[in-house]
Amino acid sequence: MVKKILNLILLGAIAFSFTLCSSAEKKEESAPEPSGQEQSAAANRSVDVNSPQAIADSLNDKLKDFRYPDGLTRPGFSYKKADVNAGDFSEWSKVNAPVIKEGLGKLPDSYALEITGHTDAIGPEQAEGDKKGNIFYSELRANAVKQALIKQGIPANRITTKGAGSSEPVSGLDAKDAKNRRVTFRFATSAPQQ
């Protein structure tokens, strides 16, 4: 008896959802055709998949999981350090440097690889007394990885660096976890070189 009642309720819910879907389709069908100006504006808003920004977005999708240290073979940078281990970085770059080189090859010179250094949430964000602060260490890490990438053949003028301090912890980790001491990568328009 209970099973029959549950089946009836389930059938009713399914029928109700079909009713809602069919009424939404009717509303879409009855929408007026956009004017010529509206169609032109919509066409201008559409993204050209060959535009530099679309290419950068696609490449950034690949880069979103890139980080150094990788978090697996080495959890993160040592505390208050920007230690790029030559052997470790060499292994990391075998996989990741080709993607970076490919991206820079596809993008105009106005785009660069942006390396962002990160820290854990231990210590102050800005310099305080004799403490240099997380921003300092995150910038130091980004610059250390930049130098290592230059040695791998990435042009220095196509790399920018910045420090985020502890403001962008790895999702799902405690802000004080060592895995937050890392650098991340993305392609972005670069500021003019001076």
Q: What does each model-found stretch correspond to?
A:
Residues M1-G71, D83, S90-K94, P98:
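N-terminal targeting leaders that direct proteins to extracytoplasmic destinations
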Residues D61-P75, P108-G117:
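Short coil-to-beta-strand
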Residues G71-P75, K80, D109-Y111, P155-N157, ...:
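Envelope-exposed proteins and targeting segments
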Residues K81-G123, K146, I150, F185, ...:
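Periplasmic peptidoglycan-binding/anchoring modules of Gram-negative envelope and division proteins
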Residues T119-Q194:
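Periplasmic OmpA-like peptidoglycan-binding domain that tethers envelope proteins to the cell wall
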